[in-house]
Amino acid sequence: MRGGGTVIIPEGTFLTGSILLKSKVNLFLESNAVVKGINNLEKYRSISDLNQDEAYYKVKPRNWNKALLLGDQVEDVSITGEGVIDGAHIQDKKGEEGMRGPHILFLSRSKGIKISGVKLRRASNYAFMSYDIERASFDNLLVEEGWDGIHIRGGKDIRIRNCRFNTGDDAVAGGLWKNVVIENCYMNSSCNGIRLIMPATGLKIVDCEFRGPGKYPHRTSGEQKRRNMLSGILLQPGAWFPAFGEVKDILISSCSFDQLDNPFLVTLNEGNRGERICLEHIRGTRLMKAAASVESWGDSSLKDVRLSDVSLSYVGNKGQEIVGRTPSKPLTDYRALPCWGLYLHNLDRVILRNVRLVCERGKVSPASCFDNVGSVEIYNVSF
């Protein structure tokens, strides 16, 4: 493969439609450089135009797949520097929810991706969207406003490090992940911090801070301008559509959750199998509505679940408990549970070690509830 080099964007604001990314090319934004999306939807191209062979691109209409910067089957491509890529919150009346416009970045079937140092602001849909990428690193990014921050559907050997998210929708989302590390990131959202909607193996979420309420409103909430942060970590393959496969070798370590409705929810659905889920060194404060939970509602139990050195402090559930009743299968978010602290459903081989649950306001239900849980080991659990 020939060619390559660096394209330098100097100081200034540059209005543009779609830019096609090429292999072995680094797009470098100098300090105070702004690449801004033009308010003309006809100037944007769709990833569907570049890749018409993959059936799943056609799940969404062509205009949903438009982006400010996009590439298909590119390798060793990078976007670096200190500048800003501004999606400009351009609305498309024919888009999703009658308002979503182009993504900022969209890559498909690509390898060797590096995005570092830049600021992604006001995405008209997702800041970064991709299908089937490998060897991608996201480092020292600031992602603000818009909808999802980084959304990857099909990713292998991915690193998301030292990034700061202040998003209107999920900070990081997607699935079909293998060997993904999310490390030392700050997640602020008016939706969820990390939402997994398809299977994943070898996922590590380490040294991350999840803090609400959202700096920017959930754009889809319209006049409500809702800002409450829902869940910190939401692992729920199959909640939005059938997504068969495994959720295994998941490590969530040294993470903090503050002023969220719910700290974490792990749920398996039909066609999912799960094992070796570890949550350790977890601290949750000022949790507001729903208990943390690990659940399987599919055709098999979730095996080998370990919670170690976990401290969760709730300020009150505000009517989110259903005392004495078996909860329903969750849909796409947390829901009412029969306890205020920790709910486990259809699990096998569970270890709870140094787990502390605190409710700072009136208790109307048990601290925890175990439903169809076998082989439980409990060491130093208090509430």
Report each predicted region and the residues it spans.
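Extracellular/periplasmic carbohydrate-active domains that bind, remodel
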Residues: M1-F383
